[in-house]
Amino acid sequence: MSETANSRTTERKQDHIEICLHGDVVFNGKTTGFERFAFEHAALPEISFSDIDLSTSFLGKSIGAPLMISSMTGGYSEAATLNQRLAEAAERFGIPLGVGSMRQALENRSYRESFAVVRKYAPTVQIFANIGAPEVAKGLTESEINTMLELLRADGLIVHLNAAQELFQPEGNTDFRHVLEQLALLSAKIPVPVLVKEVGCGISASAARQLIAAGVKAIDVAGAGGISWQKVEEIRYTRQFGQERRFSLQALDELLNWGIPTAQCLIDIGALKKESPGLNGIEIVASGGVGSGMDVAKSLALGAQLAASARALLKALHDGVLEETITSWLNDLRAVMFLTGTATIAELRHKTLITKP
């Protein structure tokens, strides 16, 4: 990659962080759907609060709590500091961490340290590498795969599906042909599990079925209700070119708020798994607008193995309260478990949610 192209990629990654922290990038008129549900109160919990156990497992490995610090950043100098602090928090709580897209690490060695720092400060927890669907569609070489995995000593590879983001991105790649074909090839030859995640538009049951058939081991629904990457890229576009001229004003609002709410994704994929018992080995991650331990708890009751968050934790990191925020979320989760009489995460997953009137 040329020096100019590297500079543009670095600028884009910096823009993403700045806009996510300070821009108006949440969905309008569309929520995660978690607010539609409530837990039934257990007047007789029959457990001690001190006995509540948040530990669980993900992809065969024990984790301290059903929470993942979701893919955010990497590939520019300032990202090393952000990733170090995220890694330190992940290690403290014993929870998984996903890095941002590693495309730039493949194209320029000078940016690899911003990713490698993660394993240095999180030596014992699950770390997930990350690459975009357009890169997968072109066919990753064995060298590229090895570079990503070895750089992090990764426990898995996340492939992110971001068609809507690429559509709005000024320099976006909208060629999504052969993604499934290449995913199947990748899943068959890679020595660690492949996870597939959206980035805020959600994964439907039909898409989940296709992904499972391609051999992925986990699906992160990353539904609508939190950050809209269309809005992030729209801000970048208008900064560069002024008024939006690509889409009609009549359609723009719906396109910017395009996506399936997170809770609906979980419900639909949960129904798919019930219809097809052979799919029960696939683990589901709930992300997209997760902003508290209550959201984590509802995610688990809706069928997720764990929940994940990016923007809320990034903002907490920016404000200097990352570990305090994670602690409060885990306390939220313990509170829900106590008030529903569930001592373990496995028990919480079997709780039935009440639909609010």
UniProtKB/Swiss-Prot annotation:
GO terms for cellular component: cytoplasm. The keyword DNA-binding does not apply. Keywords: Cytoplasm, Flavoprotein, FMN, Isomerase, Isoprene biosynthesis, Magnesium, Metal-binding, NADP. It comes from the Bacteria. It catalyses: isopentenyl diphosphate = dimethylallyl diphosphate. Its cofactor is FMN; NADPH; Mg(2+). GO terms for biological process: isoprenoid biosynthetic process. It is found in: Cytoplasm. Its EC number is 5.3.3.2. Mg(2+) binds at residue 166. Its main location: cytoplasm. It is an enzyme of class 5 (isomerase). The keyword Magnesium applies. Homooctamer. Dimer of tetramers. Belongs to the IPP isomerase type 2 family. This is Isopentenyl-diphosphate delta-isomerase. The gene is fni.
